[in-house]
Amino acid sequence: MSKKNITIIGTGAYGTALANVLADNDNNVIMYGIVEQQVDDINIYHQNSVFFDNKKINKTIRATNSMAAALENTDILILGVPTAAIKHVVNDIIKYAKKPMDIINTAKGLDEENLGLLSDKIKKYFEGSNVISTYSALYGPSIAIEVVDRQPTAIMIASETIEKAKELCNVFSNEYFYMYPTTDIAGCEISAALKNAIAIGGGILKAYNAGDNAHATLLTLGLNEMYEFGKHFGAKLETFLNFAGLGDLILTASSKKSRNFRLGERIVELNDAKKALESFNLTVEGVETARIAHEIGVKYQISMNFFEIIYNILYNNVKPISLLNNVFRDVKLV
């Protein structure tokens, strides 16, 4: 397959990991960042030490703090910024883009304003411009440092057509990074968002030394409620049983590398979610997701007993022990 000109918006850990994969596949990769020190770190020292210390990345990766330069001849554009920054970034992309591009989103979350899918909101941001050729979303169990270390990883790419998804698989996939194609954007997106809230519950159970049986119960109930939620948006069951669903859930809800999991542990340590959040300096996506998912569930009358417990712990001053006391109650499986 011919080389692609690929732009990654953001110089975060995951964007850097994807840049390394794509550069390993002989694509032309440029990253756009706003922190000059990071841009220099990538260009001069071939590393992103903010996230990966002195670990080297592919020497062909370039970085710039000029959006115009980043979009000079882009075929594929990857949105590697947090959900809250997307609207501002899209405005700049529309301003400087030279041609229509395949847009791939990696941000996780739900649409708070419209109580819907993030993908619908992002596509709406691009409306009226000639910038977006196709829209895709990339999700799955892929801790950034392991991808940079070229450890075996498998994720999913969801596109509007299976042909486009397969084409993008060929761009990304190699001997250590496998990408599976699907058209279920809704299923991938919902899985990526909701598993973060479930991971908070995983950390809570771990901190109480609840054992593997309870943890397996949590994963089972969480996965079922993810699917119940997803059905409302037309998501497919098979997606929740694949890398973006079950795979990412197992990883995020079981690993101390997950910020959401660590927050759950911290909540138990302080016995107070508000105090835990105040002491936690990192962005934890599952907190906002739990609130928005709750609002969507109420609006559309989606039964989500497990998510209600997480929501009440985070927002209604319910003590974390309530998860342990209630996780086995009102069990409803697909």
From Swiss-Prot:
Pathway: Membrane lipid metabolism; glycerophospholipid metabolism. Signal peptide: none annotated. Catalyzes the reduction of the glycolytic intermediate dihydroxyacetone phosphate (DHAP) to sn-glycerol 3-phosphate (G3P), the key precursor for phospholipid synthesis. Keywords: Cytoplasm, Lipid biosynthesis, Lipid metabolism, NAD, NADP, Nucleotide-binding, Oxidoreductase, Phospholipid biosynthesis, Phospholipid metabolism. It is found in: Cytoplasm. Sn-glycerol 3-phosphate binds at K108, G140, S142, K195, D248, S258, R259, N260. One of its GO terms (molecular function) is glycerol-3-phosphate dehydrogenase [NAD(P)+] activity. InterPro entries: 6-PGluconate_DH-like_C_sf (IPR008927), 6PGD_dom2 (IPR013328), G3P_DH_NAD-dep (IPR006168), G3P_DH_NAD-dep_C (IPR006109), G3P_DH_NAD-dep_N (IPR011128), NAD(P)-bd_dom_sf (IPR036291). Its EC number is 1.1.1.94. Pfam families: NAD_Gly3P_dh_C (PF07479), NAD_Gly3P_dh_N (PF01210). This is Glycerol-3-phosphate dehydrogenase [NAD(P)+]. NADPH binds at Y14, K108, A144, R259, E285. Belongs to the NAD-dependent glycerol-3-phosphate dehydrogenase family. Coiled coil: none annotated. The active site is at K195. Transmembrane segments: none annotated. One of its GO terms (biological process) is carbohydrate metabolic process. The gene is gpsA. GO terms for cellular component: cytosol.
